[in-house]
Amino acid sequence: MRIKIIIAALASVLLMPASAHKYVGGDISLLADYEAHSAQYYDASGQPIARLLPFFGRQGLNAMRLRLFVDPSKATDAEKGEGVKQDLDYVKALGRRIKDAGFSLLLDFHYSDTWADPAKQFTPDAWRGLSGDALNERLYDYTRNVLEEMVAAGAAPDLIQTGNEISYGMLWGPRYDEGSWQRYYAVGGTEATEKRFTSLLASAIKACREICPKARIVLHTERMAQPSYLTAFYDDMDATGLDYDIIGLSYYPYHHGPLQSLDAALTTLAERFADKEVMIVETGYYHAWQPSDVYFDYSSVYPISGAGQKAFADDLVDMLSRHGNVTGLFWWFMEANECGLDWSTNRVTDNWYNAGLFDNQTGRAMPALSSLARFNVTAGMAGHAVGGGVGGGGPVYTLGGVRVGSGNGAGQLPPGIYVTSDGRKLSIGRGHGGVAE
């Protein structure tokens, strides 16, 4: 009787549309550097982690995000010390590893030589002096060439951000020529700045559709605390017929306010843009040493500790799971880890980041890491085989109810869909282990 119930439950999962697939993971744009500097990673029990990507797969994660700069060698020393270094060769190599490990890849175009965010969207040094059609053409060519090289390298992205936190536009002009900055404003802007911005986005998206037609396009903003601006932005995108798939948001409680504000914003987006999915493409919370420049202090709600960080992650996942339009969750800089580094002579960044998912002193995985996988429990058929074996070691059955082995021997099963004794779907890919959902 039990296996019949399990099979019946699984059948409902198998019939879910592909759009029900959820992506959960993090931005790991400095992973290769931490590995090269011999950072020491441990699981929550203190056991060494030999390879971090398979470990993430065993934790239930299925997607990773990488940022890309045009020419990060042009960044300032301070920016390089913050982690600006991801040129195309770097991203191709790490992207290939991510794809080979079975994860989906979110590629984050910054369209700048350094950080791009609401306060700065500096035009790459090599593009300075370009405007109008010439700038649109350069953006199109660059995007197309990058994606061609990513595909050739075995690192084709599944999701593409055409710009990072572009609430106020992109490609404003050279960093030191403030008079040339051309900002787009969804509220109170000019027709000229709107046309300039949306034509740039259209050029980038055109290249994405041509080279990676199956990839989904994300428009990334961070104004969720200002619902009128948030809706005005995406209203403008729809009014110009911009071809995109997903609304991407940043959400850091110490910058953007309480979870209730995000909850309300997600409800508004679902009502107003019912045809669009929403992803939280950046989030995080400190487990130690909250910086002094935060806008909102929630330490009384979520203490600055491992337990406080996990409480935030749990509440975030619970809230997001109530929104059917939310299909992605990415923790920013989750790989940050100073354990094992000689910080005075052999460091990756110039400052510790204490909102990642590893303890900088012990190298152990933070409790919040275990919270993320719960976001993916309703995933549909698009699961990935990203690990080597399934925890628990319980019985495994075919869809017909025939016992064929145990979770510990999942790697020896032929490719296919199976059921674990606790009712989870087990997807076995060719040449991989399995991941239970």
Segments (PLM) and residue ranges:
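C-terminal outer-membrane/trafficking sorting elements
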Residues: 378-437
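Substrate-binding cleft and catalytic face of glycoside hydrolase catalytic domains
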Residues: 54-216, 222
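Glycoside hydrolase catalytic-domain groove-lining segments
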Residues: 49-53, 57, 195, 206, ...
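Aromatic-rich peripheral "rim/lid" segments of glycoside hydrolase catalytic domains that contact
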Residues: 41, 179, 264, 268-275, ...
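Boundary/entry segment of secreted carbohydrate-active catalytic domains
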Residues: 20-55
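Hydrophobic faces of well-ordered beta-strands that scaffold small-molecule active sites
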Residues: 24-28, 64-66, 105-109, 158-162, ...
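Active-site beta-loop-alpha junctions enriched in small/polar residues
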Residues: 29-31, 69-71, 110-114, 162-167, ...
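Acidic-and-aromatic substrate-binding clefts and catalytic sites of carbohydrate-active enzymes
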Residues: 34-47, 71-89, 167-170, 222-231, ...
